[in-house]
Amino acid sequence: MKIFLKNYTGQCVDFFRFGGNYGDSIIWHGTMNLLAELNIRIANVDLLSEKTNEILVIDGGGNFVDYYDDVRNFIIQNHERYKEIIFLPHTIFGNKQIEVLSKLRSNTTIFCREKESGKFVDSFAKSCNVFLWHDCAFYNSFEKSEMGKGILNAFRSDCESILKFIPESNIDISYNGFATKPLNEFLDTISQFEQINTDRLHVAITAVLLGKKVNLYPNSYFKNKAVFDYSLSKFPNINFINQDIF
């Protein structure tokens, strides 16, 4: 993906970053690191913005699925306005995306962050250029933290949870973040612990990069397992736990 993006070195692009939590902030910080390295400048846009540049870059994540509508609504309203559209690594699935994908043209390049999304997009975005690449969270570079003590249970309680019940000791540390929030508090919390149990993908990615022992559990669709298989399985300090625990 970096080789592809080098084509835009020295240029300014319109940049759409949807809202979110600390997981989205990890992605955004990684994206900013990458674009700064490549000397690509951005003009932030939203649903109410005028087009500033001919190229649109949509930040990566898991928003282009049926649970959420930010990316879908933005694309429906804006896809015909741009000379070129680039999706940074995304998870994409669901019936609501099919019609949108089918309308995108050959000026659209979509990076999927795991194979399941790649198959889905290949099936319905027939005119687009589709590639696999890793989540932009991996463009963050964190110093390994000290070992820490104890276990952090950091499970979600929203529509992507499949837990039977939330453990009493749970701290959903991702929930109170937002897409561009500084990472200090998030990193400091994870650093305090030796082991992290979570179904939050970017809690897991962050903890892995910090050198923690990590158990990643499924969410309500294929995202966690698919990203684990494509990107995280190579790390020795993480396991995927495909079973009920609570």
Which stretches of residues belong to each language-model region?
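Active-site anion-handling motifs in enzyme catalytic cores
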Residues: M1-F246
